[in-house]
Amino acid sequence: MNRIVEVNRLTKEYGRDAAVKDVTFAVEEGKIYGLLGRNGAGKTTIMHMLTAQLFPSSGELKVFGENPYENNRVLSQLCFIKESQRYPDSYRVLDVLKVAASIYPNWDRDLAAQLLEDFRLPLKRRMKKLSRGMLSSVGIIIGLASRAPLTIFDEPYLGLDAVARSLFYERLMQDYAENPRTIMLSTHLIDEVSNMLEHVLVIDQGRLLIDEEAEDLRGKAYTVLGPRAAVESFTAGKNTIHQESIGGMMSVTLLERLDPGDKRRAEAQGLEMIPISMQQLIVHLTQSKSNGKVAEFQ
């Protein structure tokens, strides 16, 4: 597939501290990406560099095959909805959407109107009088209606209840199916979006831990549970990312694809093999990294 973002050894330093360290990855056209990790991991810094809002200290970055900085041809194809998107206080919702329509060449007026109705936004209310959830809804409408070939959402649903978040996911997937584009989601509500993700990038302490297709990742992340001796024997030499024990029982979380022989052996030893959620996987990965136990990711 066509690569629309290419990042090579990207680094961003603030004095002696590096927010992003030697990160390399590519983003392909027509996929939904999850940019995942703990708060302060470097995700937002990466998104700001991808959208030409922050210069890297070193490394190379291309978006749609070009340097994105001061490049209107590239920037007109990007839509970045920030975690706490700010708007002029004097603007009404209607004014903000008019500006967005003038910025994005692919703006879908009908979709914007439908989303306004879905999220029950008052068109003539001034931005400074909107609740936190309403402000998030405005950002969601801009992101979806922009139809930008690369659309990036950074925690886009602050203040939204579960019903409104579910509506966002539903509308996103519906529009993505009808009008494919590349979408990048950065979120801490990983379990809510995990089934939507096609590719996963995991950032921790400024470094890239995982760059993998979501389906492949799901297929090799699981917990082995059973008597301590049997679990220790079965998991010896395997890629362990988390373990805990209670009494004579032990659970070990692995990130490694098993062959049919492994699965038969586990069953013969009376061990349970439990798939883990994407959120559990990210928690275990970043905990093991912060504890100095860096797993290898095959």
Please describe what each predicted stretch is.
Residues 80-138:
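ABC-family P-loop ATPase nucleotide-binding domains
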Residues 169-256:
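ABC transporter nucleotide-binding domain
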Residues 37-42:
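Walker A (P-loop) phosphate-binding loop of ABC-type ATPase nucleotide-binding domains
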Residues 151-155, 160:
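Catalytic Walker B motif of ABC-type/P-loop ATPase nucleotide-binding domains
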Residues 248-298:
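C-terminal coupling/interaction segments
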Residues 59-74:
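Conserved ABC transporter NBD signature motif
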Residues 51:
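Helix-to-loop junction immediately C-terminal to a conserved catalytic motif
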